[in-house]
């Protein structure tokens, strides 16, 4: 779905069938509208990420792991929702091959509420 679509359904099975991509990517774009960017992500260890320009939400579909963020370690499992503000260093640890997440970027560059000191 994209900016021209007014509504619709994004199907997990359809998106999962596109992973890995021909270039080996473990995430596929499923919805793009304005600042909203939704991908299905099925990561493999080790999980390397850099801080992002937008706020980010993860909906954990399956699996479990640990979100390492801002000097903290928070365990998560299927059904949980994770939030990472723009600019926060983060990654996953202690997860297996069954981890699947909807990854949602949204809002302006720098986040809805900028980090203190920025």
List each language-model region with its residue ranges:
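Structural motif
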Residues: 35, 57, 64-66, 89, ...
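Short, isolated positions in well-ordered beta-strands
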Residues: 37-38, 74, 90
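Ligand-binding loop in jelly-roll beta-barrel domains
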Residues: 86-112
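Short, conserved beta-strand element in jelly-roll/cupin
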Residues: 52-67, 107
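Short hydrophobic/aromatic-rich beta-strand segments that constitute the beta-sheet cores
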Residues: 38, 67-69, 101
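A short, N-terminal "cap"/entry segment at the start of jelly-roll beta-barrel domains
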Residues: 1-49, 116-118
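Short strand-coil-strand connectors
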Residues: 32-34, 68-72, 95
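Short acidic-glycine-tyrosine-enriched beta hairpin
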Residues: 71-86
């Amino acid at each position: 779905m994209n900016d021209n679509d007014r509504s619709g359904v994004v199907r997990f099975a359809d998106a999962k069938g596109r992973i890995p991509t021909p270039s080996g990517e473990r995430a596929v774009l499923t919805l793009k509208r304005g600042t909203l960017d939704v991908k299905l992500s099925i990561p493999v260890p080790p999980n390397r990420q850099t801080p992002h320009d937008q706020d980010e939400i993860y909906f954990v579909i399956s699996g479990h792991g640990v979100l390492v963020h801002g000097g903290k370690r928070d365990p998560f499992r299927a059904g949980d929702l994770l939030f990472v503000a723009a600019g926060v260093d983060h990654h996953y640890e202690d997860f297996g091959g069954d981890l699947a997440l909807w990854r949602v970027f949204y809002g302006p560059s720098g986040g809805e509420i900028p980090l203190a000191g920025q």
